[in-house]
Amino acid sequence: MLKIDKLLSAPHGIAPVLVRRAPKLVLPFAERSKSRLRAVLDNGDEAALFLARGTVLRGGDLLVAEDGSFVEVQAAAEAVLEVRAEDPHALMRAAYHLGNRHTPVEIGRDYLRLEYDAVLADMLQRLGVRAERAELPFEPEAGAYGGGHKHGHDATFAEDYAAAQAVFHEHHGHSHSHSHDHVHDEKCGHKH
């Protein structure tokens, strides 16, 4: 079994001839979002992935096995909804409502693409856009701060929170201290 623990994200600068010769790992988005995975390559070899937590593989990425060999990642065709509209406003409105539902979305120049969901297809059609089922590769946007969507205080919460705060402070122009310049005792007038 091929053990893989390194990722070279596209564009990686590896010679095209080496990429063409590499076996392919063809997976749908849900499988490309796992950091620990056993899979079969297109040449029949088995592979075990041990990647950093939160890693999302994209089509065109290269994996490096312990023996130094390369494996190219390809996004598998899967059931998706392809959303199109007659005008950009309608498409933006659809994107807004999908975002409100925390739905992973691939954003193209004139389309949105999401994992197939009959309920969302109905909602989108009620919004006045075309939502057609198709079998296509799915490459949704990464989270706003580089990771996936998180709820609660999981293993990467502190990192995600720090990244969000850094972006806020860059935009906001200054930081706020939470220290106090007085003694905390029963006479300070507030509870701690």
Swiss-Prot record:
InterPro entries: UreE (IPR012406), UreE_C_dom (IPR007864), UreE_N (IPR004029), UreE_N_sf (IPR036118). Residues 170-192 are annotated as: Disordered. Belongs to the UreE family. It is found in: Cytoplasm. This is Urease accessory protein UreE. Involved in urease metallocenter assembly. Binds nickel. Probably functions as a nickel donor during metallocenter assembly. SUPFAM superfamilies: Urease metallochaperone UreE, C-terminal domain (SSF69737), Urease metallochaperone UreE, N-terminal domain (SSF69287). Transmembrane segments: none annotated. Its main location: cytoplasm. Residues 178-192 have a biased composition (Basic and acidic residues). The keyword Cytoplasm applies. Keywords: Chaperone, Cytoplasm, Nickel, Nickel insertion. The gene is ureE. It comes from Cupriavidus necator (strain ATCC 17699 / DSM 428 / KCTC 22496 / NCIMB 10442 / H16 / Stanier 337). GO terms for biological process: protein folding; protein-containing complex assembly; urea metabolic process. One of its GO terms (molecular function) is unfolded protein binding. HAMAP family: UreE. CDD domains: UreE. GO terms for cellular component: cytoplasm.
